[in-house]
Curated annotation (Swiss-Prot):
SUPFAM superfamilies: IpsF-like (SSF69765). Homotrimer. Its EC number is 4.6.1.12. Its cofactor is a divalent metal cation. A divalent metal cation binds at D23, H25, H60. The record marks N52, S150 as: Transition state stabilizer. Pathway: Isoprenoid biosynthesis; isopentenyl diphosphate biosynthesis via DXP pathway; isopentenyl diphosphate from 1-deoxy-D-xylulose 5-phosphate: step 4/6. It catalyses: 4-CDP-2-C-methyl-D-erythritol 2-phosphate = 2-C-methyl-D-erythritol 2,4-cyclic diphosphate + CMP. GO terms for molecular function: 2-C-methyl-D-erythritol 2,4-cyclodiphosphate synthase activity; metal ion binding. Involved in the biosynthesis of isopentenyl diphosphate (IPP) and dimethylallyl diphosphate (DMAPP), two major building blocks of isoprenoid compounds. Catalyzes the conversion of 4-diphosphocytidyl-2-C-methyl-D-erythritol 2-phosphate (CDP-ME2P) to 2-C-methyl-D-erythritol 2,4-cyclodiphosphate (ME-CPP) with a corresponding release of cytidine 5-monophosphate (CMP). This is 2-C-methyl-D-erythritol 2,4-cyclodiphosphate synthase. GO terms for biological process: isopentenyl diphosphate biosynthetic process, methylerythritol 4-phosphate pathway; terpenoid biosynthetic process. PROSITE patterns: ISPF.
């Protein structure tokens, strides 16, 4: 093709950014009364996590994915400040703070989550997780994809010592 005859591409109206986040926590002893909270949902018959907060690894992984787009650190900075000054341990509040860090011209369009752990059992609550995460993030449940694996005993998570979560999200950014 002759470079002199090339037509310049129009400036795109939308650019897409990808965020990635991870979090993991070890379970407390079985005798603990702290609830096991994942994606804002309580999972019965499983102890809570060793964490200063409620230990919600799904919300934490989403926060970290948003931070990778906005460069505003929520966990370890904003969350610690909320804990120390106001005693807030609810990871849903941390996620709300992460969402506020998005620019007005940015919108999350898709969230993909994968969880590894032999317990609790996730399959029966996948729909409730999608619904709750979508509600907190002002998305539709079809914008949330969740997969879970037991790990089959190959890692500490697969052996039942804790749970690990990865999140990849797509952010659409409008450009003038």
């Amino acid at each position: 093709m002759d470079r002199d005859n090339e037509v310049p591409l129009p400036k795109p109206k939308w650019i897409y950014r990808t965020g990635i986040g991870q979090d993991s926590h070890r379970f407390l002893p079985e005798s603990s009364t702290k609830p096991c909270i994942l994606g804002g949902i309580i999972f019965d018959h499983c102890p809570g996590f060793q964490a200063n907060s409620d230990g919600d690894i799904i919300f934490h992984a989403i926060c970290n994915a948003i931070s990778s787009v906005t460069n505003k650190i929520i966990l370890g900075k904003v969350a610690d400040e909320l804990l120390q000054t106001r005693g807030i341990t609810d990871s849903g509040i941390y996620l709300e703070e992460a969402l506020k860090s998005l620019k007005p011209n940015q919108k999350i369009s898709h969230v993909a989550i994968t969880i590894e752990g032999s317990r609790p059992k996730f399959l029966c609550k996948l729909s409730a997780l999608r619904q709750n995460i979508a509600q907190v993030m002002n998305l539709t449940p079809t914008d949330i994809g969740i997969t879970a694996t037991s790990g089959e005993g190959l890692s500490d998570f697969g052996c039942g010592d804790g749970v690990q979560c990865f999140c990849v999200l797509t952010v659409m950014e409008y450009c003038d």
